[in-house]
Regions:
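N-terminal leader/auxiliary helical segments
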Residues: 3-52, 174-182, 195-196, 205-209, ...
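A diffuse structural propensity rather than consistent per-protein peaks
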Residues: 8, 137, 141-147, 169, ...
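Extended hydrophobic/aromatic-rich secondary-structure runs
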Residues: 52-60, 237, 241, 245-265, ...
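Solvent-exposed soluble domains appended to multi-pass membrane proteins
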Residues: 268-280, 290, 295-649
């Protein structure tokens, strides 16, 4: 082996180009100037390097060393990019080793298709770092990490990406510079495996062994999706691999046709006994799922210069009002839609999955199908692009008769970049006024006005609300948006108070916003880390109400969850409950709230993980999971009693 330094003019030109790039990065991020100088010297020396390998055994050994060493380096660079020093220190040694094996699997898989080890290293390293970079920005934007199910949501993410600011920190800059040096160095070492077939066999064999070992070592390890737990508990690459594993749904314990049959016998009645409201005619039912609408006081107390939602707070007559658990935080709105409409729960699906893009292929039983079966016209409204979360395909599959997206709204009525709640509500009123005589109408609307992020300033939005004491610009913008939503809500309720026909309005938030971590720390003293189960569930709590323009009992609901709201809406509307909703109504008495993180235990007076349930609580949860699996995944043996709509198509 011969190693030489050849100082050529072309290397100076390459150095100048590299330094211009590094200088731009320096002024963007601002890191120590000695890093810039060190990069320049290192880059010039590497480009001047000449390496000759004459011995085939030396080439083989060096090739193996490059693949193994590069896997170690890349795995650590991924962790360095995503986590600060404190969080990086939390990962267990065996988990870091598994992340290195994940990298090695990628390197060896690429090597199967190339003869050149250097090319393999460049392709693999750059692919993994770009992949980590995607997660870096996804976490900045929504407060959760990028996992396997997000691959189906790329188009939706890109559609709102322009509303976010792409910012690099110093760690990201160092990773970019180090990757540039790594690529330059690897290009200087020319190692090829001549016996390509044998090389492919060895690589595939090692990949299989690595995958088997990773699978064995991670049995019982859960996919973490909260904040950065995936990266500092499992390591990001391993956590992503776990999310792939969790995309396959297993039959629940105790699942059988006999259990389904027993439940069918119990809930085959007409559901009239569950009706608690005498309504002369079917009411118009309007649902408003308000984007990022939340009551942040459930997380902790804070003061503002004026009341944020005075009208919402004033509603007291003919209303059921309270708080509900959502299964998502900061993103993945369609999961909240799905829980509300179907009565199903994300509790039994993989962490981070998006039902609209993974599990809806046939028309599911839902409030849409239930109302269509009794003659309602079902309308969906969403003032944004129809392709978001594949709604253009999902809504017709759900059974909606009409769908209205961004082109059906006045696109001059914007707050920031999104169509206002006021415009959405005016469209609801317009559709109501155009309904035919004796037409029963159901409208499912999803607003867009309050969508994150909340850092950019807009000339068309005067922020009226600000927090007192420590002030955070994103929190102020978010609270000001809620204030505008409150004004629009007053318009909607006031209009339907004046109509003669019965009307029911169901209103709830889809999830809490993702705001500055320090703002949350000011609310609960901890921020987003180190929370108890009760404190964590506070971050998944959203307000809701079911209001009618006719006389109904006023009720305060301390806690429920989105999967129960459609059942509660049917009960309050005086509509006989279908069998599945009968089951949910009974279950709610024992399990008042359930979501992707756990459930509220009445017997214990606190939130618990599903696996910690005992006694009657465990029995209800098990039956719920069995019915949901039968509904979603056992199409051949699907219950005709609980899920008749699919059978009648």
């Amino acid at each position: 082996m011969k190693i030489r330094l050849n100082f050529e003019k072309t290397n100076l030109i390459r150095l100048i180009v590299a330094m211009i790039f590094a200088a731009v990065l320096y002024f963007k991020v601002t890191f120590p100037v000695y890093v810039l100088a060190g990069f320049g010297v290192s880059y010039f020396l590497i480009k001047s390097l000449s390496v000759e390998l004459n011995n085939k055994w030396l080439r083989l050994a060096l090739g193996i060393l490059m693949l193994g060493g590069s896997s170690v380096m890349t795995a650590h660079m991924v962790q360095y990019l995503l986590l600060d020093a404190e969080l990086r220190a939390r990962i267990m040694g065996n988990k870091m080793f598994l992340n290195i094996l994940c990298c090695l699997v990628v390197y060896l898989a690429v090597q199967v298709f190339t003869k050149n080890v250097g090319l393999t290293c460049i392709i693999s390293h750059m692919a993994l770092m770009i992949f980590a970079g995607i997660n870096y920005f996804v976490y900045l934007f929504r407060g959760n990490e990028f996992i396997f199910s997000d691959l189906r949501s790329i188009s939706t993410g890109l559609s709102v990406a322009g509303n976010y600011e792409f910012v690099l920190d110093d760690r990201a800059a160092y990773v970019v510079l180090l990757s540039a040096l790594y690529v330059a160095f690897v290009r200087k070492i020319h190692v090829t495996f001549e016996k390509r077939l044998w090389m492919a066999v060895v690589c595939i064999s090692v990949v299989i062994c690595c995958c088997a070992y990773i699978g064995t070592e991670t049995e019982g390890t859960v996919t973490e999706t909260w904040e950065q737990k995936g990266s500092y508990r499992n390591g990001y690459l391993l956590n992503f691999a776990l999310s792939v594993r969790d995309s396959f749904i297993a039959e629940p314990d105790g699942y059988s046709e006999e259990v389904i049959s027993e439940l069918e016998d119990q809930y085959s009645g007409d559901g009239e006994s569950y009706v608690n409201q005498d309504v002369e005619k079917n009411p118009t039912i309007i649902v408003v799922m308000s984007e990022s609408y939340a009551d942040l006081s459930v997380v902790g107390d804070f003061l503002t210069n004026e009341q944020v939602t005075p009208y919402y707070d004033s509603l007291q007559d003919n209303i059921m009002k309270g708080h509900a658990l959502s299964s998502v935080f900061g993103a993945k709105t369609p999961n909240s839609e799905w829980e509300f409409m179907t009565g199903n729960s994300m509790a039994f699906l993989p962490s981070g999955s998006v039902v609209y893009q993974q599990y809806i292929s046939d028309t599911p039983t839902s409030i849409v199908s239930n109302l269509k079966n009794i003659g309602y016209t079902c309308v969906a409204m969403h003032p944004y692009y129809e392709t978001g979360w594949s709604r253009n395909a999902v809504y017709p599959t759900m059974g909606f008769d009409e769908t209205h997206f961004i082109d059906d709204f006045d696109q001059t009525k914007l707050l920031r970049k999104y169509i206002t709640d006021q415009e959405l509500y005016e469209s609801i009123v317009e559709r109501y006024e155009s309904k035919k005589a004796n037409e029963d109408l159901f409208i499912m609307s999803i607003s867009m006005q309050n969508h994150g992020g909340y850092t950019e300033k807009y000339p068309n939005f005067n922020e009226q609300i600000r927090t007192l004491g420590a002030s955070y610009s994103d929190a102020n913008q978010y609270l000001s948006l809620l204030h505008e939503s409150d004004k629009a809500l007053e318009y909607l309720i006031s209009y339907f108070q004046s109509v003669d026909d019965p009307v029911e309005i169901v209103f709830f938030g889809d999830h809490q916003p993702s705001l500055n971590t320090n703002f949350y720390k000011g609310l609960n003293g901890k921020g987003l880390s180190g929370l108890t189960e009760d404190e964590l569930e506070n971050l998944y709590t959203v307000p809701f109400f079911i209001w009618t323009n006719y006389e109904t009992e006023t009720e305060e609901v301390p806690i429920t969850s989105l999967n129960y709201l459609s059942t509660m809406a049917l009960e309050r509307a005086g509509i006989a409950l279908p069998s599945y909703n009968q089951f949910l109504a009974d279950m709610q008495e024992t399990i008042p709230a359930i979501n992707s993180r756990g459930y509220y235990s009445v017997s214990s007076g606190c939130f618990k993980h599903l696996e910690d349930a005992t006694g009657e609580e465990a029995e209800w949860i098990d039956r719920y999971q069995i019915l949901q699996y039968n509904n979603m995944f056992d199409k051949k043996k699907q219950s005709k009693v609980f899920f008749p709509y699919l059978q009648n198509q």
